[in-house]
């Protein structure tokens, strides 16, 4: 039996407090809103009780943030794309940010199990004055559990329409991509951290973010397989290849905290669920 679940999440500012409202259809929802940083920032945990997707499953996530609202979204655990008998497993996330909105999109990794046939799509639309920090982390198999990614396909699509597009199809049979030093070089975790602005960011602002990312990279064990660029005036990206998820996630969290301090003068404040 396949699932088609849909979540629509809205952030609004009400009496100087960012408030989340949602409606859902199927096994996809958010937990109680938390305010560890005060009323201005609403923290939410997105949960999918079945715990993963098999062939035929579809998850649709629509997020809208209104003017002056600030939401932070994470997940309690990894997303999982399991073995398919032929049908596609699909997750689509669409984020729309109104003028002056801020959003932090920080889900834990997506794990591609051997035999999966999956797509993970993220589309971001930001009006002038809106800003977002987000990341995308993909694990190909579970190397430490002796569960390699030996067959299957995974399509990864991240897009800011008219500004930035990252799209790649990973096939377990493509040994040149997976093993070549011009491809993944044997790494099994692919991760990106990105800053999206609805207004072209000043060069000095982008250079400050790049400098913070590069300083963290230079001090990290992944310095040979990580880099930061600004392909467009509205985008800054940190990309990482790692043998497993943990070191990549450590680097992303470090730079995320540095970026939110630089951009929004906010202290480090990790979602509480990460500590459980």
From Swiss-Prot:
SS bond partners: none
GO MF term list: nickel cation binding
UniProtKB keywords: Chaperone, Cytoplasm, Nickel insertion
GO cellular component term, pick one: cytoplasm
Subcellular location: Cytoplasm
Pfam families found in the cross-reference section: UreD
InterPro entries reported for this sequence: UreD
Quaternary structure (record): UreD, UreF and UreG form a complex that acts as a GTP-hydrolysis-dependent molecular chaperone, activating the urease apoprotein by helping to assemble the nickel containing metallocenter of UreC. The UreE protein probably delivers the nickel.
Family: Belongs to the UreD family.
PANTHER family from the UniProt entry: UREASE ACCESSORY PROTEIN D
Its biological purpose: Required for maturation of urease via the functional incorporation of the urease nickel metallocenter.
This protein's name: Urease accessory protein UreD
Species for this entry: Variovorax paradoxus (strain S110)
């Amino acid at each position: 039996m396949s699932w088609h679940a849909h979540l629509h999440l809205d952030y609004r500012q009400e009496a100087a407090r960012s408030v989340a409202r949602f409606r859902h259809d199927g096994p996809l929802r958010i937990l109680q809103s938390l305010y560890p940083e005060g009323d201005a920032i609403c923290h939410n945990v997105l949960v999918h009780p079945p715990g993963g997707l098999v062939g035929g499953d579809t998850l649709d996530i629509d997020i809208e943030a209104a003017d002056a609202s600030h939401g932070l979204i994470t997940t309690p655990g990894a997303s999982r794309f399991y073995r398919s008998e032929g049908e596609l497993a699909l997750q689509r996330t669409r984020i729309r940010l109104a003028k002056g909105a801020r959003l932090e999109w920080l889900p834990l990794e997506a794990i591609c199990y051997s035999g999966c046939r999956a797509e993970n799509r993220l589309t971001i639309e930001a009006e002038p004055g809106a800003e977002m920090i987000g990341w995308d982390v993909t694990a190909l198999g579970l190397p430490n559990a002796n569960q390699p990614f030996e067959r299957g396909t995974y399509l990864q699509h991240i897009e800011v329409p008219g500004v930035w597009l990252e799209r790649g199809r990973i096939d377990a049979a493509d040994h040149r991509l997976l093993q070549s030093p011009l491809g993944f070089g044997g790494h099994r975790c692919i991760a990106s951290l990105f800053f999206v602005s609805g207004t072209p960011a000043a060069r000095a602002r982008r250079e400050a973010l790049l400098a913070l990312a590069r300083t963290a990279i230079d001090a990290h064990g992944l310095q040979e397989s990580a880099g930061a660029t600004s392909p467009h005036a509205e985008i800054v990206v940190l990309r990482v290849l790692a043998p497993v998820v943990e070191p990549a996630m450590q680097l992303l969290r470090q730079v995320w905290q540095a970026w939110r301090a630089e951009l929004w003068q906010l202290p480090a404040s990790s979602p509480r669920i990460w500590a459980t």
